Amino acid sequence: MEAISGMLPLIVAAPFLGALLPGLMIRAGRDTCTWFTILPTALALLMLVLHAPAVIAGEVFHFRLAWLPALGLNVNFMLDGLGLLFAGLILGIGLLIILYARFYLSREDPMGQFFTYLLLFQGAMVGIVLSDNILLLLIFWELTSLSSFLLIGYWNHLPEGRQGARMALAVTGMGGLAMIGGMLILGNIAGSYDISVILENKEAIQASEWYLTALVLILIGAFTKSAQFPFHFWLPHAMAAPTPVSAYLHSATMVKAGLFLMARLWPVLSGTPEWFYLVATTGLITMVIAAVIALFKDDLKGLLAFSTVSHLGLITMLLGFGTEAAAVVAVFHIINHASFKAALFMTAGIVDHETGTRDIKRLGGLRHLMPVTFVIAAITALSMAGVPPLNGFISKEMMLKETTYAVWAGNPWLMPALATLGALFSVAYSFRYIWHVFMGPVRDDYPKPPHDPGFGMWAGPALLAAIVVLIGVMPWLAEPFVAAVAASVTAAAPEVHLKLWHGVNAALFMSVAAILGGAALLAMHGGLEAVWQRAGPPAAKRIFDALVGGLTAGSRRLTDGLHDASATRYAAILAIATVGAGAIAWTTGEMGMPTREPLPITTLPMIGWVLLVGATATLVAFHRNRLLALVLIGVVGLVVSVQFVYFSAPDLAMTQLSVEVVTIVLLLLALNFLPQTCPQEPLGRKLRDGLLAGAGGLAVAGLAYAMMVRDFAMPSISAFHLENSYKGGGGTNVVNVILVDFRGFDTYGEIIVLGIAALVIFALTDAVIKGPGGRWLANWQSDRPDAGDRHPLMMVVATRVMMPMALLAGIYIFLRGHNEPGGGFIAGLVVAIALLMQYMASGFGWAYERQRVPYHTVIGLGVLVATATGIGAWFNGRPFLTSDFGYFRIPPMNEFELATAMAFDVGVFLAVVGAVMLALASLSSMNRRAGETVNVDPMDINPARAQDAQLEQEA
């Protein structure tokens, strides 16, 4: 039975919105900050609880909102039994962790920052478990990796914290990338990315040839997140985080995300031999290996970390069995593990907080000094060991029973034997947690005088310990909830019978053997530890570090070989790749005969071609002279502009010409500090470069000719633009309509890149001026003779007289651009050239005094205007940057057209002007620092004021 609930997105959004509060409320005090962190969590939990009765009764709630339907990405949420379980754990235990953290964190720890990270992580986890779209789930999945990175590395002053955070991000991030591929394959097989649809296509998915590929990729993501072998090593190193983080992320939330994913997709992926051998085997290996390592860990949190890995392996193994009964046990143990493990982590934090150490060898006898903590720790540790009458005993015995039905490669004894071995070591490390920390005589060398903490720290673990006892003594209370969750996992109605006594059976004997064997192992711990140390404990971190180091070294060698800051090297790589790709296509493909007649060769284009080739050849011959090479580049650009005019492309011609003027002026400023000539290249390098250049040029020429004399295989898009330019964009200048409407998003990206380039120029020049380079500039002597008159009077007068006309020309070009050649980009270049001429003619000091414009702001304003124009289309129900137009009449004027594209063009105009002028100001500042004098000619301003302006600009 399905129902619609508008609360589901609110449950997900509440923690994200609440993350804004702790940082603001910390000024009001730690208690206020804590309450404002509790508020969004409690609100989300309340909304979840309101749905609980209906969900337990079998109802499934949905919320659907189309977001990017063309990509299959929709904001779809689903609340069923499985989602209720995990969301309840995330929010319920989250409340206890927030209260615990209030008293755990010291006053030196930035509490507002901690709670912000915690709520971001909480929201991402709730998003995962309530998502009904695998693409949406992937977004939340990656958000958990990022937010957990911040939480694990919260104590960033500790090297262990930074290393643990990086390791967790690297491992889970790698798994996330693999999982993306698996999810895309899964959605492609099912024909939808909605989870509810995927769950209805079991037969199609398992019959697909891509089933195994999708399964492996998805399991890599799940195994890395849930720390399964061989990816288990990151979780213990994440214990460098504060204990509230460990208790939250590594008992009930982050490490359970992989289990959730396997449980969510269990109906369509399980039941095959591939699923059994991959999942059950991995879980069993993880369970045993981690349990063995945990026994020999002397760090309290390290012991609990490996115990967590072991229990996650246990649950993974149960899910891998692929039976409904095993799925029921997995669900039940998820609940039990979350309750006792969160409490154990918090008691470990209490011990560390009150004694000053987590080293088990420095502890002991704490039952007399910390009786409340001892009771809580004893109850929860005994539950972890599987001792009756606690909840851990029930799920452990049910697990052992399920292993007796599992046959691995024809062997019915292997899995029960190894599972019993894992349970035996689980008992041993659980008993060690109690015996070596709390039992024995009181010591006199504790780092701090131990005592029980205040109520705020032990209230949370005490509540969880009470749940451990309650479920253990009265397990039938949990039956309806476990049944609802198991029904969601199995897509069936499995029978659920939870009871403390299951009778005398094989599972009971296995359980007794585990308890007795675990006690015996603890008694022999000293001797076993000596053997363990001599054997050399496994150190997966060394393998991981070696792997990462090898990859880093290899990438560095590759980067050094390809990326050496040499434009020649980059051009060579591009030429080789282009020629190689073209050669492969030419030799393996098929090309039809020419279908078009080339245009006849006439005198004018021939002259242009000769000039172009001549200028290029001269440039190659005299390229060592930097100034001459720059002039020849300008000649090449001018000839290209004329060719554009000849071929009826006035927009391109004006743009090309304007760009040539701007770039030459800026390059002249940049070349001022370089030697007049380039170094002489060896003959071998010249021959190599000439060969590559010739091959690249011939390849491009051949491709261009082949395209010009043949019709396109697909219909040309030109007809669409010509037909829809006026109807869709309201303009007859097709080029401009393409820039501001059809391909407006490209233009939007280009102005952002242009702005970033200008800001980079500013940042680099500013760093040079304020750094050691500033002293070099102050002592720099030019190797070129100075001009007799830096600012000729004739040029000064001409530029000032032409300034208004140039600005009017820019405005005219801007306004006519939608229907005639022009537009915001060209107009911006024209206005920038007009301003450049003022700086060139009268000097920076004179121009800056009269044009105090913050060009950073101009760039930002241009991008904001363009962005606002694009967003405005949303309010009209259209995609981003879709323009609209209409006709208006204001008497006595004639009817005229207004288009929203004009506002976008304003943004382009501002961004272009700001970028050019900021680059000019940045480069000219280096010349002024190098000792260039401010213009003191009669038409100049007061020299003192000009000097002040110069000093202010340099400051």
Predicted regions and their residues:
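Hydrophobic alpha-helical transmembrane segments in multi-pass integral membrane proteins
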Residues: E59-M125, F260, A280, A571-A572, ...
